[in-house]
Amino acid sequence: LICYSQMYNEIIKTCENGETTCYSKTWRDHRGTRLEKGCGCPPVKYDMIVKCCKTDRCGN
């Protein structure tokens, strides 16, 4: 599976160990709105939003 690994959809990462999900996670802190992308589908705290998907380059 190929997932984006940075805020801007320029850098991609090939997931390892049979990972079948990509994610895009957003939250706000003292620096403003933050965005993280990668492989997997991580658990999140109540003030975060995570979107998980299962196709190549789907975490826009």
From Swiss-Prot:
Spell out the molecular function terms from Gene Ontology.
acetylcholine receptor inhibitor activity; ion channel regulator activity; toxin activity
What does the sequence similarity comment in the record state about its family? Belongs to the three-finger toxin family. Short-chain subfamily. Type I alpha-neurotoxin sub-subfamily.
Q: Which domain of life is it from?
A: Eukaryota
Which cysteines link up through disulfide bonds? C3-C22, C15-C39, C41-C52, C53-C58
Q: What is the lineage of its organism?
A: Eukaryota, Metazoa, Chordata, Craniata, Vertebrata
Q: Which organism is it from?
A: Micrurus surinamensis (Surinam coral snake)
Gene3D superfamilies in the cross-refs: CD59
Query: In which tissues is this gene expressed?
Result: Expressed by the venom gland.
| Any Pfam family | Toxin_cobra-type
GO annotation, cellular component aspect: extracellular region
Q: Which UniProt keywords apply?
A: Acetylcholine receptor inhibiting toxin, Disulfide bond, Ion channel impairing toxin, Neurotoxin, Postsynaptic neurotoxin, Secreted, Toxin
Which residues lie in coiled coils? none
PROSITE patterns from the xrefs? SNAKE_TOXIN
Q: What's a single GO BP term from this record?
A: modulation of receptor activity in another organism
| CDD domains (UniProt xref) | TFP_snake_toxin
Question: Tell me, what does this protein do in biology?
Answer: Produces peripheral paralysis by blocking neuromuscular transmission at the postsynaptic site. Binds to and inhibits the endogenous nicotinic acetylcholine receptors (nAChR) in human rhabdomyosarcoma TE 671 cell line with an IC(50) of 346 mM. This neurotoxin is lethal to mice by intraperitoneal injection and to zebrafish by injection at the back of the dorsolateral region.
Under the heading SUPFAM superfamilies, the entry gives: Snake toxin-like
Localization per Swiss-Prot or TrEMBL: Secreted
- Give a yes or no for keyword Zinc in this entry: no
Q: Does the keyword Disulfide bond apply?
A: yes
Protein name, UniProt field: Three-finger toxin MS3
Q: Which InterPro entries does UniProt cross-reference here? A: Snake_3FTx (IPR003571), Snake_toxin-like_sf (IPR045860), Snake_toxin_con_site (IPR018354), Toxin_cobra-type (IPR054131)
Major subcellular site: secreted
Q: Give the residue spans that cross the bilayer.
A: none
